[in-house]
Amino acid sequence: MNKTQALHQFWNSFEIDAYEENSVPDDAKLPYITYQNESDMLDVKCLLTANIWYKSTSWKKIIDKAEEISKKINLHGHYIKEFDNGFLYITSGEPFMQTMSDPADELVKRVLLNITIEYLCSY
């Protein structure tokens, strides 16, 4: 598994689809996660964002999903995923979570997550 696959696997471990932010299929249905991918760097911290998207009258499900992600990252103060020749190291950014509404559709809810990732080389 390479770095990109490790990050993709992390975001797809939350029981909803996840896509790199510029590759969401036209027929994708909410809820889903979009995320940035900076896989060119090694041994450098990168500040990235991910977005959780839901369509609902309530914020409960989307906030619950954000808290699930937070728990996975912060269980040990970080999350580590092994990939070929290294490790993906994820920590929470600050602020970790921001809620946003969509002015075009009041049912669309968005939570922006700030994270820090670092690809640590093992050779």
Q: Language-model segments: what does each one mean?
A:
Residues 1-22, 26-27, 34-123:
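Charged, amphipathic alpha-helical segments and their flanking helix caps
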